[in-house]
């Protein structure tokens, strides 16, 4: 049975007002930046969602033109049942956006991410959505799920991994392989590290974790170890898996990450005289190559 995909239950004109239950720092000492794990109470409304979807957050106040702020979309980091597995919450993984102003050189902080990162437990939050059909998990319990994330791109994959391994459901018992490639700058930036390591210990046959820690590890050329270097390193095995009809590949994170991944896959496919860009187009047509970058 195809799961009904909920979309836009709450629209920007009439958002759902949830409550912040908790807001915890995910980056440990020695890491860079701030990334928060937020849990919102949604028990009072009709908000439903699936793993791989996003919700919109409308920051309070007005922009420089006196207009209400536009919503920002964030990938959901929890399964449809929420972190407490009681169907009453939704979680986000939010990095505080900061950048240097091109003209003044001042540090500018993102409006919505700063609002969320500083949100206190008990505070109201305006939520819209859910949206997204691109990043949904297949129903097939024997599927191979390849996930490639940088930074907070881990959010949907945390939802996937909880769904696959943590929650045992009568109607969904995963027997396939889930392989996560995760790119971060420093070890303390490994978001959800403890959860990931527990899964590795508990499900060594079904879960693989490959980290690319750019400021601590070196690639074979002596440069920084980025996610695309790990893809290249494992390209032959990935190519073998990707040819299976029930393999799904998901990419989530910063816009620039796709180029390097394509390079690695291109080299592997090339060994078998396959043109990767043609092959990838076919995968996209069959809804087996899923990309969400921002």
Swiss-Prot record:
Keywords: Antenna complex, FAD, Flavoprotein, Membrane, NADP, Oxidoreductase, Phycobilisome, Thylakoid
Cofactor section: FAD
Membrane topology summary: Peripheral membrane protein
Subcellular location: Cellular thylakoid membrane
Short name of any one Pfam family annotated for the protein: NAD_binding_1
GO cellular component assignments: phycobilisome; plasma membrane-derived thylakoid membrane
Domain of life per record: Bacteria
Reactions the enzyme catalyzes: 2 reduced [2Fe-2S]-[ferredoxin] + NADP(+) + H(+) = 2 oxidized [2Fe-2S]-[ferredoxin] + NADPH
Classification via InterPro entries: FAD-bd_FR_type, Flavoprot_Pyr_Nucl_cyt_Rdtase, FNR, FNR_nucleotide-bd, FNR_plant_Cyanobacteria, OxRdtase_FAD/NAD-bd, Riboflavin_synthase-like_b-brl
Entry keyword annotation includes Thylakoid: yes
Main subcellular location: membrane
Keyword hit for Secreted: no
Annotated SUPFAM superfamilies: Ferredoxin reductase-like, C-terminal NADP-linked domain, Riboflavin synthase domain-like
Top-level class of the enzyme under EC nomenclature: oxidoreductase
Gene3D superfamilies: Nucleotide-binding domain of ferredoxin-NADP reductase (FNR) module, Translation factors
FAD-binding FR-type domain sequence ranges: 13-137
The enzyme's E.C. designation: 1.18.1.2
Family per record: Belongs to the ferredoxin--NADP reductase type 1 family.
PANTHER family, sorted: PTHR43314
Name this polypeptide is given: Ferredoxin--NADP reductase
């Amino acid at each position: 049975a195809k799961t009904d995909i909920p979309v836009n239950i709450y629209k920007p004109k009439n958002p759902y007002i949830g409550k912040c239950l908790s807001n915890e720092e995910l980056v440990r000492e020695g890491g860079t930046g701030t990334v928060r794990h937020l849990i919102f109470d949604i028990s009072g409304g009709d908000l439903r969602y699936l793993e791989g979807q996003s919700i919109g957050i409308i920051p309070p106040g007005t922009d420089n033109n006196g207009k209400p702020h536009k919503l920002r979309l964030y990938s959901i980091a929890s399964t449809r049942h929420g972190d407490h597995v009681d169907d009453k919450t939704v979680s986000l993984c939010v990095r505080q956006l900061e950048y240097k102003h091109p003209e003044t050189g001042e540090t500018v902080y993102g409006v919505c991410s700063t609002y969320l990162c500083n949100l206190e437990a008990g505070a109201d939050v305006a939520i819209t959505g859910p949206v997204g059909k691109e990043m949904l998990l297949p129903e097939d319990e024997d599927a191979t799920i390849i996930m490639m994330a940088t930074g907070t791109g881990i959010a949907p994959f945390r939802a996937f991994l909880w769904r696959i391994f943590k929650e045992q459901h009568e109607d969904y018992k995963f027997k396939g392989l889930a392989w996560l490639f995760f790119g971060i700058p420093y070890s303390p930036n490994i978001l959800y590290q403890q959860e990931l390591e527990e899964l590795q210990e508990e499900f060594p046959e079904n879960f693989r974790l490959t980290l690319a820690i750019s400021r601590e590890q070196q690639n074979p050329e002596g440069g920084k170890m980025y996610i695309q270097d790990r893809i290249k390193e494992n390209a032959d095995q990935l190519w073998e898996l990707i040819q299976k009809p029930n393999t799904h590949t998901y990419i989530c994170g910063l816009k620039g990450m796709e180029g390097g991944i394509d390079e690695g896959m291109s080299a592997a496919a090339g060994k078998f005289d396959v043109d990767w860009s043609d092959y990838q187009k076919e995968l996209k047509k069959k809804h087996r190559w899923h990309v969400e970058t921002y």
